[in-house]
């Protein structure tokens, strides 16, 4: 594997780890997650549609990072598990995708979407549910700060 891919995978794993551990306090859902043998993380990416290449490659990198963490023993002995969801490269679908991940799949964090428009549609849902969202590719300056206010549950690399 090329060096930059190793560095990118390690950086993504570190970012996911930091977000997961930051979001592990309080709440029944978080208590349930703390008692299981795995940490369930949602991945809402553009797997079909106009920008599917962005989503597919980012999901591939996330899987590599999670595999490395799991091979090293996981986080506090717990394995990471990804629940994938295709937002079809559409902001309205991104909202639906993230809603399902948060409310039905009960993930403790969401990685993705890849594009700024899909992230913008997703952050109100994750914020309302106090679930961290990591936007690994989105570039809009309003992803993490809007009107001078830092978004508490949104992280960008």
PLM-predicted stretches and their roles:
Residues 30-31, 59-82:
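Signal peptide-proximal N-terminal region
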Residues 106-157:
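Extracytoplasmic ligand/sensor domains, especially the bilobed periplasmic-binding protein
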Residues 48-51, 66-73, 102-105, 111-114:
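Sec/Tat-exported extracytoplasmic proteins
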């Amino acid at each position: 594997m090329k060096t930059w891919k190793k560095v990118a995978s390690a950086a993504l794993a570190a970012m996911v780890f930091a977000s997961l551990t930051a979001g592990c306090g309080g709440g029944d859902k978080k208590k349930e997650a703390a008692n299981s043998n795995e940490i369930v993380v949602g991945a809402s990416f553009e797997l079909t549609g106009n920008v599917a290449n962005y989503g597919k490659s980012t999901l591939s990198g996330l899987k590599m990072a999670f595999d490395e963490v799991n091979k090293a023993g996981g986080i506090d002995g717990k394995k990471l598990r990804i629940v994938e969801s295709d937002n079809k490269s559409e902001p309205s679908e991104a909202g639906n995708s993230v809603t399902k991940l948060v409310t039905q799949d009960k993930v403790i964090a969401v990685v993705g979407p890849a594009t700024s428009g899909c992230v913008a549609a997703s952050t109100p849902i994750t914020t309302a549910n106090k679930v961290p969202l990591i936007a690994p590719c989105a570039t809009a300056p309003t992803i993490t700060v809007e009107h001078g206010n830092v978004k508490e549950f949104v992280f960008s690399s």
